Amino acid sequence: MKKFTKLKGIAALFADINIDTDAIIPKQFLKTIEREGLGKNLFYDQRYEKDYEEKPEFILNIEPWKKAKIIIAGDNFGCGSSREHAPWALLDFGIECIISTSFADIFYNNSVKNGLLPITLKKDDINVLTDLAFKKEILTINLKEDLISVRDINISFNIDKIVKNRLINGYDDIELTLKNESLIEQYEKNKDKFFDWKYIE
C-alpha cells in the first residue's frame, strides 16, 4: 500500500450531507474486484448524463477540480451499504484525502485499509477550508504533524495513532499481520499456558 506522509493539492467541495456509497460508486460497477479503472465511474449518476457524457456543472468536471486530490465533504460522508469499491474509486480517480465533520464507520475503516486518509474536523474548521476551496487554494496535508496548511493558515487535526502509523508506513492488513509474525508465533507456542484446556478423548 502506498505510504501517506504529505499531500499537496486542490480540494473539491461536496457540501451535501449523507453522501452515501451508492452515490460514490453505483451498484452496477461492483461486479469487478479490480481496483484500476473504477475512477471513471466515481459519482457516475451526478457526473454524467449518459454514455459518460459529462455534466458541465458537476465539480469534478470543472477545471481545476478535475485534478482534485482532496474532497471537503458534508456530514456523515460514506454512509449506506458497505462496499470497498468506494475508496477504490476515489483513489483511482486521484482523491487521496477526505475531510469531513463525520464519516460512516465502515467507510472510514475501508478507507484506512486502502490508504485513503479520512480527516475529521470541527464545523468551524470545515467552513474555513470551504472558503479556501472556493478560491482554488492549494492545501498541504502533513500527516506526520497532524496539520493542514494553506498559506499562513494552519489547522490541526486529531487521528488515531494506530491509523496514523498504518498510513504513514503503508501497511495493509497482510503487512500488519506479517509485522507481528514473531509475536503471533510466540503466542501459538505458549497459548496452552494461558487457558485451562480440557481435552476429551
Predicted regions span which residues?
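Cytosolic catalytic domains that perform sulfur/thiol-centered chemistry
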Residues: 1-74, 78-81, 85-105, 109-110, ...
